[in-house]
Amino acid sequence: DIYKFYKLVENESHPHDYIDSQPEINERMRAILVDWLIDVHTKFELSLETLYLTINIIDRFLAVKTVPRRELQLVGISAMLMASKYEEIWPPEVNDFVCLSDRAYTHEQILAMEKTILNKLEWTLTVPTPFVFLVRFIKAAVPDQELENMAHFMSELGMMNYATLMYCPSMVAASAVFAARCTLNKAPLWNETLKLHTGYSQEQLMDCARLLVGFHSTLGNGKLRVVYRKYSDPQKGAVAVLPPAKLLSEGSASQHS
């Protein structure tokens, strides 16, 4: 079973805390990059697999290579190019990315960075991102469209925020489904079927789910609004506009865990 395999190997391809080893890059810069890439991803109408793989490539690369601040966007562009080639039938061309970055980088620079990243990551692009788990866990929740949209929204909020990297991909995915169920007041919030399919109990998901709901509650005030805009669209059920889960908001969750 491919999911059992992914569960076994997810920690091998999951980057852990690296930001302190990057002298010129901080969590905020990473968030700005991811925010921009989610926008680019939407413009190109790429698959969600491509988006999640892009962010995984960036984080794994930053965990093994010091990158100057001026090259961070170049890493992002090259990662999305690689992920697109891997996941899409019709990937964007290098020149599309040159134009998108307002010609900040040349065709040659993007291809050279792509090669550097591939070599550093030893050409490993078949990795379990939160997305592979999310699709399965949403199915196990027997969702309506609103729950599906909300779980994707929660997961992309997690992707934006460096703090989420503390948790392995399957836990982020399970927490996104749990946080979505809490936000939409689904009863029960968690059940044996979900526990069986995810491998996590409600208690195990509390911390990560609380983190995701915390991102939701501060989202409207921030400058990085791409995920908020994307999920405020009626096509996505405007789930971003719904009030954050009270059960998991700071202060109240301790009584329920």
Curated annotation (Swiss-Prot):
Protein keywords: Cell cycle, Cell division, Cyclin, Mitosis
Stretch forming the signal peptide: none
Keyword Cell division among record annotations: yes
Gene3D superfamilies noted in UniProt: Cyclin-like
SMART domains xref list: CYCLIN, Cyclin_C
Gene Ontology molecular function, alphabetical: cyclin-dependent protein serine/threonine kinase regulator activity
GO cellular component, one term: cytoplasm
Pfam families to which the protein is assigned, alphabetical: Cyclin_C, Cyclin_N
Disulfide linkage: none
GO terms, biological process: cell division; G1/S transition of mitotic cell cycle
Alphabetical list of PANTHER family matching this protein: CYCLINS (PTHR10177)
Subunit structure: Interacts with the CDC2 protein kinase to form a serine/threonine kinase holoenzyme complex also known as maturation promoting factor (MPF). The cyclin subunit imparts substrate specificity to the complex.
Family in the record: Belongs to the cyclin family. Cyclin AB subfamily.
Known role: Essential for the control of the cell cycle at the G2/M (mitosis) transition.
Protein name: G2/mitotic-specific cyclin S13-7
